[in-house]
């Protein structure tokens, strides 16, 4: 577990959190978590959000290629996250 934490910190830490898309995805996750009264990590982990921000999927099939997203979570949250990515990309094109 400790090496995994360090690896993720190295891959996604510090500067990565400044990524605007990552911040937008985190905000959406926080909103969904509040609405569902669950911890944010139940929606998606930080590592999943980081991979999503890096890959910026534009379709359901691309979303399924993001680490940590399977059919169930894609069906439940995919539409909201794909819209957030599309909105972000349009605003920052």
Question: Where are the regions that the model predicts?
Answer:
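Accessory DNA-binding and partner-docking regions appended to nucleic-acid-acting proteins
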Residues: 1-93
